[in-house]
C-alpha cells in the first residue's frame, strides 16, 4: 500500500489538486475532474464506474459522504460538467482493486468528521502512520479528536503524568496540552538561587576588596619590606653593596669616608675592609681613603672606588659595555672605550684643532696633528670634559700622552712674551 501511494504521488507531481483526485479515487466516489475527463473523451468507460460506496465500503463507511462543499460526492450523484482541467489531467490508466475489509484503517478518514473537515481529512489518506501523528495533528486541527483506538500510542503518552516536561501534572499530549488552560507551570530556566558570599563574581572589581587590604598576621611578607629605603643627603641611593650597613653609621662621624650618608659606593678592597673592622678607631683614616687592588702581585692603588672597580674588570675579563650598533655587538671593559668605538660608526669628530679648525674622532689623532704645527701637545677638547673615562688611572693617562722631546720649543707665552694673541688661543 505504501509503494502504491508513493507511485501515485510521483505520477501526479505532488500537486494538491492531483492529490485530491487520487484521494477521491480511493473512496470509489466520482471526482469532478475525473468525470469531466470522461465526458471530454467521448464516453470512455471508467475502470471503477461500477464501484458503489454502500456496497463495497459498507464496513468502513456506513453513511454516504456529504456533498455540501462539493469536494466529494456520493456514488449516485450526477457527474459534474466539464471544466478547463479536462485536457490537463488525462484519466489515470491503471485500474485499482476493489476495497476489502482488510484495508489499513490509518489511511482512511476518521468516522466522526463533519463536512467542514473534509479538506483537511483528504490529506490523511496520503499520510503514513507516524508515531508523532497525534501530536502535530492535535496542534494543527484543534477541533479534531484523536484517531481510532488502534493508532499506536506515542512514547510520551506512556508516562502517567502525560507530559514529561511538567512536574507530574496531568495534561494532554503535545501542543494540545500546552494550549489547555490550567495552573501555570514553573519555567524551564528558573531564576538562579542566591549563592553564599564564598563565591566571587565573574567580573571582579578593578580594586581589591577592603578585607584583603587590612593588615593582619596572615600576610607572608611583612609590610616593612615595601617601605622605601633611606636616601642619603646627596640624594643618591646606595650602591651594589647596599646589604651592608653604611660605614660610620654607628660612629656618628660627619667627616668620614661614607659617614652620615655621604652617598659614596661601598668598596670591598682590603683597605676598606680593614677600616670597617677597626670601626671608630680608624675614624681619622677615613678622611682620605685609599683603595688598593687585592689581586696578588698587582698592588695598584686608586683614590676612587669606581676606578678600582674598572681596574678589577681587567683582571676578571668582564666586559659589561656592549655596542648596540647593527651587526656589531663588541664588548668593552670601560665606558670610555665604548664611546670611542661608537664614534667609528657615527663618524663624529668632536676634537677640533684650534689653529686650522680640522676635526678628528680621537684625541690622539688631534695630538699627532698638532705636532705638525710645532705645538707641544693636544689642546683641551672644545666641550670641556675629558675624553678618557673615570675608570682610567693617572698612570694610564700619562702613558697615553705622547712623549715630549727635549728639543721641543717652549710654550709660546714664554717664548713670545709680547704676543698676547697666541697666548689667548692656547689658554682656552
Swiss-Prot record:
InterPro entries in the record: Znf_C2H2_sf (IPR036236), Znf_C2H2_type (IPR013087)
Modified residues (N6-propionyllysine): 41, 45, 358, 368
Coiled coil region boundaries: none
Post-translational modification, as annotated: Propionylated. Depropionylation at Lys-368 by SIRT7 activates transcription factor activity and positively regulates bone formation by osteoblasts. Ubiquitination at leads to proteasomal degradation. SP7 is a short-live protein with an endogenous half-life of approximately 12 hours.
Record's note on what induces expression: In response to ascorbic acid induction, expression is activated by NFE2L1 in osteoblasts.
Molecular function GO terms recorded: DEAD/H-box RNA helicase binding; DNA binding; DNA-binding transcription activator activity, RNA polymerase II-specific; RNA polymerase II cis-regulatory region sequence-specific DNA binding; zinc ion binding
GO CC annotations, alphabetized: cytoplasm; nucleoplasm; nucleus
Main location: nucleus
SMART domains tied to this protein: ZnF_C2H2 (SM00355)
Record's function text: Transcriptional activator essential for osteoblast differentiation. Binds to SP1 and EKLF consensus sequences and to other G/C-rich sequences.
Record comment regarding domains: The 9aaTAD motif is a transactivation domain present in a large number of yeast and animal transcription factors.
Protein name in the entry: Transcription factor Sp7
Gene name in the database record: Sp7
Amino acid at each position: 500500500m505504501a509503494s502504491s501511494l508513493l507511485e501515485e504521488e510521483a505520477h501526479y507531481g505532488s500537486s494538491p489538486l492531483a492529490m485530491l483526485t487520487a484521494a477521491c479515487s480511493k473512496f470509489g466516489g466520482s471526482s469532478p475532474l475525473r468525470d469531466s475527463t470522461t465526458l471530454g473523451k467521448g464516453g470512455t468507460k471508467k475502470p471503477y464506474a461500477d464501484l458503489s460506496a454502500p456496497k463495497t465500503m459498507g464496513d468502513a463507511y456506513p453513511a454516504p459522504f456529504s456533498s455540501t462543499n462539493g469536494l466529494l460526492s456520493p456514488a449516485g450523484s450526477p457527474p459534474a460538467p466539464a471544466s478547463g482541467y479536462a485536457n490537463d489531467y488525462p484519466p489515470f490508466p491503471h485500474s485499482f482493486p476493489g476495497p476489502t475489509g482488510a484495508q489499513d484503517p490509518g489511511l482512511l478518514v476518521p468516522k466522526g468528521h463533519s463536512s467542514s473537515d473534509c479538506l483537511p481529512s483528504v490529506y490523511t489518506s496520503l499520510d503514513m502512520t507516524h508515531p508523532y501523528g497525534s501530536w502535530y495533528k492535535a496542534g494543527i486541527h484543534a477541533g479534531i479528536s484523536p484517531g481510532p483506538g488502534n493508532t499506536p500510542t506515542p512514547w510520551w503518552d506512556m508516562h502517567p503524568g502525560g507530559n514529561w516536561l511538567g512536574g507530574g501534572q496531568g495534561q494532554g499530549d503535545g501542543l494540545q496540552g500546552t494550549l489547555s488552560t490550567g495552573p501555570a507551570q514553573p519555567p524551564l530556566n528558573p531564576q538562579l538561587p542566591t549563592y553564599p558570599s564564598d563565591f566571587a563574581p565573574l567580573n571582579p572589581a578593578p580594586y581589591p576588596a577592603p578585607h584583603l587590604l587590612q593588615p593582619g598576621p596572615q600576610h607572608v611578607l611583612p609590610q616593612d619590606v615595601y617601605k622605601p629605603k633611606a636616601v642619603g643627603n646627596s640624594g643618591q641611593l646606595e650602591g651594589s653593596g647596599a646589604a651592608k650597613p653604611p660605614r660610620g653609621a654607628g660612629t656618628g662621624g660627619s667627616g668620614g669616608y661614607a659617614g652620615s650618608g655621604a652617598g659614596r659606593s661601598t668598596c670591598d678592597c682590603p683597605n676598606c675592609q680593614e677600616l670597617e673592622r677597626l670601626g671608630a678607631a680608624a675614624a681619622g683614616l677615613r678622611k682620605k681613603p685609599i683603595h688598593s687592588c687585592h689581586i696578588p702581585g698587582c698592588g695598584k692603588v686608586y683614590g676612587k672606588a669606581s676606578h678600582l672597580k674598572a681596574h678589577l674588570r681587567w683582571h676578571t675579563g668582564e666586559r659589561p659595555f656592549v655596542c648596540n650598533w647593527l651587526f656589531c655587538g663588541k664588548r668593552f671593559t670601560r665606558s670610555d672605550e665604548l664611546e670611542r668605538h661608537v664614534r667609528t660608526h657615527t663618524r663624529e669628530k668632536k676634537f677640533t684643532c684650534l689653529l686650522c679648525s680640522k676635526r678628528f674622532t680621537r684625541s690622539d689623532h688631534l695630538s699627532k696633528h698638532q705636532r705638525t704645527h710645532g705645538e707641544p701637545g693636544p689642546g683641551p677638547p672644545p666641550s670641556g670634559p675629558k675624553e678618557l673615562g673615570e675608570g682610567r688611572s693617572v698612570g694610564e693617562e700619562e702613558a697615553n700622552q705622547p712623549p715630549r722631546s727635549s728639543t721641543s720649543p717652549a710654550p709660546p707665552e714664554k717664548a713670545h712674551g709680547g704676543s698676547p694673541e697666541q697666548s689667548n688661543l692656547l689658554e682656552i
